[in-house]
């Protein structure tokens, strides 16, 4: 229900958005309600007339008039709070008046509602209930949302409160320290300055009792909550008795608190000013402001420009350049913008631009290259007075099965050949042998003789002092023998020829000496300067003479080095051991390698955890020409990498990061170089149809892995090639099986095995894992598998020719050619060509071959027959039918 414009109209009206109400006959008025702090609000109130009989109006109005009479106003007090107004009496709700109209002063009786009005009222009440239910649900959802938000906000507030308390505690400690410092300074200032404020405070104390009564009011109004002598902090509590008279509640007296120190008191009030024992001192905030002012004046003074020497590499970021110059990066970017270049703070600029910026800002520039991090690692010249003789390093080289390892076993009194798979050497090994005559040690390096291990032989020749060329007396000079000669000459080391297997009946040492002349190796017996010794590793013949020749050659070389310097060496072999981690076989060439040294080899670094000799013993250090196994690398280095000891880990990280970057760039240039050239595009078009054989290779050492990759690379052709998805050192893991599953690849394990999880995953996913111990078997199997991907060769074999004499139309068969075989034979089911005027018009197969209405398999030359083609009928007299057979021949690599 809504009220109409006419206040006297009592008719009912229904609004669809409001509930049904009855408009009462009331009179309205306004009352101004007062609040604390001087705030007021105008409130609309309802005036109700009360029916009075006779002269009862006089006595009824008496209490109201008495209550409305204002109390005498007290004298104005500055510190008293404003008197709050009494709240208006609660008004009765309109619903009670509507429900009981007979009690109103007007005495009006409502009429009975009609059916339409009752229906409208019921509809309005139903709508109101639905709306109330929706509002209740919305309110509950809002409360739930606020509760969750309040929980998060509460946690944030608690964290902020903890930070604030910690900050306040820190400030409190700082202020306490400053306060103590100021007290100490005042104490030193002198006692006279402290007496003067005390004398000035004495008359103020005597005047305090007389000043207090003047500030108190003479008469206090009821309900006023101020107390004489108090601050404007809040009103006093007022208690009213049963008669309505207000009486103040007197709070219990508190014990007088001790006066706080002058440094800790707050605002200056009248009471504190009159009762203070000394003059007010300077506050901590004032002292802090003065200090900040002095600092501000000092900062406004012009500062002297600091000139720095800036090290500028080949490429540097703007942020790094600004840090090295102690300048703001914004200033550097602004200078680049003046030159017309837009850059961000993390952009990389070249050395020339960086030098220009640094010089413009007044700094000096020192240009360095990225490779300068490797300066001082190798080839440091030693003082000749600090050098001492060292043992020679001898590399045994030669063709496969010429007895290199057997000769070394005879010298070492060991049996290495039996430990190698297939009785052939597939790893490079380093050993030390003590000469029985001189007692001096000789370091031997055994290299494989297979064609696949060319890189191993090259590494052995680089780190050696003397090369022993082993040639079998019954076999002579072979391809790998020639390769070993070339490696030795490239390294510039002397050669000692060991003619082995002289115990065999067909041994011909003179033939070996003569064949060596073709490769510029002239032995002493033929007038040259190359030493040759006839030995037998099986019978241990002339081994002492061979050791004597090695010692003599070492004396001629005068091998010396400094043992008291950081170690340098070469990684002979590297592998990933399951129990020990990355293990590298290192030949120390200069200095002494100790446990705990920080080492760098290639792109890997580490700290030496243990050193193991060739005999399997753990040692604390390794001197020059000593081969050891080094444990402690972060990852297995590559065979052939040079090892160096650095002073700290920071230098090691710089070197390894530079080398890793160079390695990535080299790999990127090999794979993505010349992509835009025409030749590269043409080669890519040719290799689009090339089939790939995906492989994952895991080997025991880096050298074997390198040899396998080189051999597989040579197997590739224009039609098929091996695609190496991953190649690494160590056992076959589950991640290798997962990678093979994605590309349907074959996993090859060379002298390694798969762990239990990897084997189970391979069996579950159908991934083939092949294990090998001999490199030749691995290469042969991959060669056969890749040959299966080659398209077979198709070869045609001519059978014979036939001439068509006449064409016959036969029902249910179609056209049949009557032919005479001119040469050879014609077979049913063979491939045929239809030639007309020396032009091939059709190629297909014979569907029918008859002779005198009988199906035959073949027809000989000179005989007549009937022929029909499959799905072809356009045959004419005079055409020639050529019959041939296609043979499929499997290809191989």
UniProtKB/Swiss-Prot annotation:
UniProt region (G3), positions on chain: 446-449
UniProt keyword list: Cytoplasm, GTP-binding, Initiation factor, Nucleotide-binding, Protein biosynthesis
Annotated stretches, region: G4: 500-503
Ligand binding (GTP): 398-405, 446-450, 500-503
Low complexity bias spans: 59-70, 93-104, 197-226
Record's subcellular location: Cytoplasm
Keyword Cell cycle among record annotations: no
Gene Ontology cellular component list: cytosol
Pro residues bias (residue ranges): 71-92
Family that this chain belongs to: Belongs to the TRAFAC class translation factor GTPase superfamily. Classic translation factor GTPase family. IF-2 subfamily.
Name this polypeptide is given: Translation initiation factor IF-2
GO-annotated molecular function: GTP binding; GTPase activity; guanosine tetraphosphate binding; translation initiation factor activity
Keyword match Nucleotide-binding: yes
Region: G5, residue numbers: 536-538
Domain tr-type G: residue ranges: 389-560
Entries under SUPFAM superfamilies matching the protein: Initiation factor IF2/eIF5b, domain 3, P-loop containing nucleoside triphosphate hydrolases, Translation proteins
Function: One of the essential components for the initiation of protein synthesis. Protects formylmethionyl-tRNA from spontaneous hydrolysis and promotes its binding to the 30S ribosomal subunits. Also involved in the hydrolysis of GTP during the formation of the 70S ribosomal complex.
Region G2, residue ranges: 423-427
Region named Disordered: 1-266
Chief place where the protein resides: cytoplasm
A matching Pfam family: GTP_EFTU_D2
Biased segments, Basic and acidic residues type: 128-148, 155-196
Region (G1): 398-405
């Amino acid at each position: 229900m809504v009220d109409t414009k006419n206040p006297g109209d009592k008719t009912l009206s229904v609004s669809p958005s409001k509930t049904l109400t009855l408009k009462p006959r009331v009179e309205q008025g306004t009352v101004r309600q007062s609040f604390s702090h001087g705030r007021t609000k105008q409130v609309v109130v309802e005036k109700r007339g009360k029916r009075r009989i006779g002269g009862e109006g006089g006595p009824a109005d008496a209490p109201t008039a008495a209550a409305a009479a204002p109390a005498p106003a007290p004298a104005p007090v500055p510190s008293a709070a404003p008197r709050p107004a009494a709240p208006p009496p609660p008004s009765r709700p309109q619903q009670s008046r509507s429900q009981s109209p007979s009690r109103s002063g007007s005495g009006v009786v409502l009429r009975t509602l009609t059916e339409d009005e009752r229906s409208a009222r019921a509809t309005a009440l139903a709508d109101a209930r639905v709306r109330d239910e929706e509002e209740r649900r919305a309110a509950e959802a809002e409360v739930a949302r606020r509760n969750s938000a309040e929980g998060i906000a509460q946690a944030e507030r608690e964290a902020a409160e903890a930070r604030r308390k910690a900050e306040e505690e820190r400030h409190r400690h700082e202020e306490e320290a400053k306060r103590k410092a100021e007290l100490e300074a005042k104490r030193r200032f002198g006692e006279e300055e402290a007496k003067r404020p005390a004398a000035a405070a004495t008359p103020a104390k005597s005047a305090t009792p007389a000043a207090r009564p003047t500030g108190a009011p003479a008469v206090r109004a009821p309900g006023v909550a101020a107390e004489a002598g108090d601050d404007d902090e809040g009103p006093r509590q007022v208690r009213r008795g049963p008669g309505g008279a207000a009486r103040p509640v007197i709070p219990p007296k508190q014990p007088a608190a001790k006066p706080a120190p002058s440094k800790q008191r707050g605002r200056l009030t009248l009471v504190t000013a009159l009762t203070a024992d000394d003059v007010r001192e300077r506050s901590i905030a004032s002292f802090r402001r003065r200090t900040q002012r002095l600092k501000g004046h000092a900062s406004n003074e012009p500062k002297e420009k600091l000139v720095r020497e800036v090290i500028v590499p080949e490429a540097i970021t703007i942020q790094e350049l600004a840090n090295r110059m102690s300048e703001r990066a914004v200033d550097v970017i602004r200078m680049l913008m003046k030159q017309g270049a837009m850059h961000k703070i993390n952009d990389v600029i070249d050395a020339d631009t960086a030098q220009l910026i640094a010089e413009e800002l007044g700094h000096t520039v020192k240009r360095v290259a990225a490779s300068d991090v490797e300066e001082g690692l190798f080839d440091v010249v030693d003082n000749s007075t600090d050098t001492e003789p060292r043992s020679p390093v001898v590399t045994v080289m030669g063709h496969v099965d010429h007895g290199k390892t057997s000769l070394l076993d005879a010298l070492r009194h060991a049996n290495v050949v039996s430990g190698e798979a297939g009785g052939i050497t597939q790893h490079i090994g380093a050993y030390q042998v003590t000469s029985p005559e001189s007692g001096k040690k000789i370091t031997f390096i055994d290299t494989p003789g297979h064609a696949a291990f060319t890189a191993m032989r090259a590494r052995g020749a680089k780190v050696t002092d003397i090369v022993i060329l082993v040639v079998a007396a019954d076999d002579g000079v072979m391809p790998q023998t020639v390769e070993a000669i070339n490696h030795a000459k490239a390294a510039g080391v002397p050669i000692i020829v060991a003619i082995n297997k002289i115990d065999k009946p067909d041994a011909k040492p003179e033939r070996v000496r003569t064949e060596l002349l073709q490769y510029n190796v002239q032995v002493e017996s033929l007038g040259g300067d190359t030493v040759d010794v006839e030995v037998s590793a099986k019978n241990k013949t002339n081994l002492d003479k061979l050791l004597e020749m090695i010692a003599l050659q070492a004396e001629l070389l005068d091998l010396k080095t400094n043992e008291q310097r950081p170690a340098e060496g070469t990684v002979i072999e590297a592998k990933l051991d399951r129990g020990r981690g990355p293990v590298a076989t290192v030949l120390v060439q200069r200095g002494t390698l100790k446990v705990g040294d920080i080492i760098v080899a290639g792109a890997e670094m580490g700290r030496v955890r243990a050193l193991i000799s060739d005999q399997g013993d753990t040692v604390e250090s390794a001197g020059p020409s000593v081969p050891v196994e080094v444990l402690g690398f972060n990852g297995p280095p590559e065979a052939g990498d040079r090892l160096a000891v650095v002073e700290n880990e920071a230098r090691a990280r710089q070197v390894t990061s530079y080398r890793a970057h160079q390695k990535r760039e080299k790999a990127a240039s090999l794979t993505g170089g010349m992509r835009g050239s025409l030749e590269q595009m043409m080669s890519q078009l040719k290799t689009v149809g090339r089939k790939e054989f995906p492989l994952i290779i895991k080997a025991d050492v880096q050298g074997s892995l390198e040899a396998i990759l080189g051999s597989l690379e040579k197997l590739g052709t224009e039609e098929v090639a091996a695609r190496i998805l991953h190649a690494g050192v160590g056992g076959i893991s589950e991640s290798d099986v997962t990678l093979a599953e994605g590309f349907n690849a074959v996993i090859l394990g060379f002298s390694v095995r798969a762990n239990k999880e990897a084997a189970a995953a391979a069996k579950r996913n159908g991934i083939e894992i092949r294990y090998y111990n001999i490199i030749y078997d691995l290469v042969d199997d991959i060669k056969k598998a890749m040959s299966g991907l080659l398209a077979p060769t198709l070869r045609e074999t001519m059978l014979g020719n036939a001439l068509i004499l006449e064409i016959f139309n036969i029902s249910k068969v179609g056209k049949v050619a009557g032919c005479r075989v001119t040469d050879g034979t014609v077979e049913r089911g063979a491939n045929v060509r239809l030639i007309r005027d020396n032009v091939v018009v059709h190629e297909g197969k014979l569907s029918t071959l008859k002779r005198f209405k009988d199906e035959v398999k073949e027809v000989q030359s000179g005989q007549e027959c009937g022929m029909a083609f499959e799905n072809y009928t356009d045959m004419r007299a005079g055409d020639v039918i050529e019959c041939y057979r296609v043979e499929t021949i499997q290809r191989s690599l």
